[in-house]
């Protein structure tokens, strides 16, 4: 099995556990988010500390911003998921994040073509397009199945979620290149860290 495909499978497992926790109990979800949040912060600290010649004040401000962001992200996620309707919405958005990641990988490997950016040389324009196509297809199909109608608003949300996922991925890729590292951590031995798996969700879900 292709190494990158394995990473996508790990991403799906993490998302499945998160969705299962949401469906079962908010306390379980809370513990899950705490674990993910702590590991994300630790990995982020390590990445920033490896950036050459970074000033102490800048290092402190970047880390402070990330801690605040993760805290707000996890808190709002937990609060919103306590409402059934919003829980369904979050469920659809998380599935869209998965579709964005898988779509980008499949299209990028199959069609290849021009690179998207120097920040992440493995990313291609075809992959970015595939990411959007997969996301819009999934979110539109799921919404139609649940409501028996096409919702333009949800369609637009899916577009922004897909773009957000790709921006999150590029952001973490940018930091890894600056730090000269391949993976954000070793939480999943041989397959990277937590940030490697949830980078897209950090921007995609809040949108």
Regions found by a protein language model. Name each.
Residues 1-159, 163:
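Membrane-embedded alpha-helical bundles of polytopic integral membrane proteins
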Residues 112-117, 177-186:
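Juxtamembrane helix-boundary/capping and inter-helix hinge elements in multi-pass membrane proteins
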Residues 118-129, 184-198:
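Membrane-interface alpha-helices at helix entry/exit sites of multi-pass transporters
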Residues 174:
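LysM (lysin motif) carbohydrate-binding repeats in extracellular/periplasmic proteins that recognize
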Residues 197-207:
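Final/C-terminal transmembrane alpha-helix of multipass membrane proteins
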């Amino acid at each position: 099995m292709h190494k990158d495909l394995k990473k996508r499978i790990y991403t799906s497992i993490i998302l499945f556990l998160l969705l299962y926790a949401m469906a079962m109990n908010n306390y379980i979800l809370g513990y899950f988010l705490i674990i993910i949040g702590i590991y994300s912060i630790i990995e982020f600290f390590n990445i920033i500390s490896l950036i050459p010649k970074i000033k102490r004040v800048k290092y402190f401000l970047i880390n402070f911003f990330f801690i605040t962001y993760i805290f707000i992200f996890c808190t709002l996620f937990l609060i919103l998921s306590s409402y059934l309707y919003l829980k369904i919405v979050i469920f659809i958005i998380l599935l869209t994040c998965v579709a964005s990641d898988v779509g980008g990988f499949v299209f990028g490997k199959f069609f290849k073509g021009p690179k998207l950016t120097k920040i992440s040389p493995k990313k291609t324009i075809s992959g970015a397009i595939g990411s959007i196509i997969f996301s819009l297809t999934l979110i539109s199909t799921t919404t139609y199945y649940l409501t028996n109608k096409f919702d333009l608003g949800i369609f637009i949300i899916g577009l922004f979620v897909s773009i957000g996922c790709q921006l999150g991925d590029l952001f973490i890729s940018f930091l890894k290149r600056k730090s000269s590292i391949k993976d954000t951590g070793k939480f999943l031995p041989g397959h990277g860290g937590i940030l490697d798996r949830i980078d897209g969700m950090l921007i995609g879900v809040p949108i």
